[in-house]
Structure formats: C-alpha cells, structure tokens
Amino acid sequence: MPGSSLPHDSPVPPFPRVALVSSHLGRWPHRRTDWFAALSTACNQLLAVGSRLLFVAGTTTAPYLARCGKLFGHRVETLDSTGVSREDRDQLSVSNADVIIALAVGNRSRTRSLIQRVLEAPPESRPPVWFAHSTSLVSREIAEKWTTQGARPFDPSTRRWPDPPVAEGAIRLATDRMVESGDWLVHCTRESAGRWPGQPQNEYLDDLILGRNSADHSVQATLRKILVERRLRAVSRPVRGLPPAVSFSASPLEELLTRRVFRGHRGRWDFEPYGLAISRAWLAARGARPVVYRRPKDLRGDDPFEQPTESRGPRRRLDWTSEEEWRHPGDVDLSSLSASQGLVLVHRDSDLRYVAGFSRWPVLVLGHFRQDTSAVQ
C-alpha cells in the first residue's frame, strides 16, 4: 500500500524499533530490483520518519541499513551480536523489534520459520508483521497463510530499467573481411557483482536502494561503460603482490562461443561473449605480452607475465594453456585505438541497443557464427 504508514490501530510506539529481515539476496545484488524496491518502499512509505532500524551484523539487510537511515530519515540502532551464530542473528533483531518487516522469504528458509513462530504467538503479545506483496519475494502460499494469521502485505513500488534508446545509423556491423583480416586479441568482460572500480561505496548503495539506472551492472552495462570511458580497467592478479593487469586471449573469434565452459564451483561461465577484440600489434606496442606458461611447481612468483599450465578443479584438472593468454600491465587506454584496430563483441542482435551510439568500432554479433565455427551466418 504505497503512500501509507503503519496504521493507527497497530500497537506500535513512537519511533519504533524495526526488524527488516530477509532470506539471502544472492551474489548479484543489481539483479534484485524487486528486493530493493521492497526495501525502499518499507523505509520511505511504510515507516514514519525517525523509526529505529535494527542493525545486526551478518544479516541480509545489514549492508544497506545505514544508507536507508540517511536517505529516508531514520536512525540505525546496532545490536551486539557477539557470540550469536549467523543463523540466529535475524532472531536477535526480531526479538528486539516493535515492528517486523519481511522483504523476501524462501519457501524453506529460516526466515519463513522465524516469522511463522512470531505469528503463532497470541496477537496481543507479538509485534505487527508486514511482508512484501510480490510473488518474486514471497510466494502466494506463504502470503495467503500469513495474511490469515494477521500479517499485513505491502506493495513494493514498481521498477524497471528502461531499454537504452537506439540511435539511427549509430551501429556499424563488422564484416567477414574485418574478422578475417585482423590479428585479434580478445578481452571478454562480465557483469559486476559490486561497485564499479573507483566508485564510492555510498553511491553504489544509493543506486541500488533508489533504483537508479546506474544500478544496472549487467554484462551489457559493463560493456557500455567501457565504451563510454574508452578504457579497460586492470584487475588484481590471483597472485598477491603482482601488479594489476588486463588479460586477453588469442583464441579465434569464431570459436569463442564453443570454448565457453560453465564453472559449477563458481556458479558462472568462465567468460561471457561480450567485450573487445583489439589488434595484437597495437597492444604489443603498448606493452602487452603473451604469458609464460609454467608448471605449478616451477612458478617463480615474481613474474607478472607467468601463468600456471593447470590447476586442480573440483572434479578435474583445468588446462589454462588453451586460453593463449596475453597480459597488459595496468589499464588499457582505448582513446587512440582507431576504428580499424578494434571490434566490439556482443552475443545477440538484441544486445546492439546497448552499444548503439557509444561505439567508434564495428560491432560483431558472435551469435551469427554457425556452431561449426566455419563462417558468419
């Protein structure tokens, strides 16, 4: 019920202590626009200004409460969780609350069991319970049961990032001749699980909570950011102490899709089919070099261009030599990369709208390659 606050018939004192509880958010916060819509609606429209948000370290909502307090005029009260197991920290918040608000509830989650125990207490001896009225956050089964037990639903504000506009004539597609004539090194990007490099933490959190377009950290948004900044940001190497670098692969463009491997232990593909192909000669002139593959026992540890030949995965050994990796120390400044020395890589035709108007380089749709990798369809 957007625009409303806690009703007068709720036994709630002024400036109530509020437990905001939730099942796990997942490793990709920017994907959960529904969750952040529920959080901001609860703080901005359900609660009166000056409410006290209960902070318990290690809970799903904890990273966002300080910013919610600043954005919506609430205080944040920290509860001491020393000696409390991570599994019981929502219980600590709930047991000290005048109001309980459930943002997301898994069907078999501890959050569901916790709220269910609260609702089984006599109405006069329990705090009011609210929950997000959205099937992506709370299942219909749970919502119906809790409503009959006296919990109240609230409607999160609707959010959807608008599709980026496509500028007429702003996309130049790569031709077969461009693909075949270039000696390309490929850099693939991926979605960002956290803030952008150099982005202030508070700005990142505000983007998520307020549902700004800049909260989109998908792989397409990451690629668009690279094109706008004309810079590939170096990342830290797995070996501690070695300088940040940008990695490339000498793998043929037409084989990229067939070379992808899903890494189950990481819950993701080893790379996404989005990024840039850059002239090998252009990169080499700026300090890029092929890595030196060494057996793990022969690694020196002080060579920024060395890479183990293999590593042990959860089920089998992983051979890294097939990546044919090159490495560039530090950021790659793309401002001097001419239109003939680079290609922008996207997976599907539907991705073209994300790079329209931003790319000075031709765009190659990798999905146009036939699965036998022999040609572009």
Predicted feature residues:
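Glycine-biased, small-residue-rich flexible motifs in mid-sequence functional cores and linkers
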Residues: 1-170
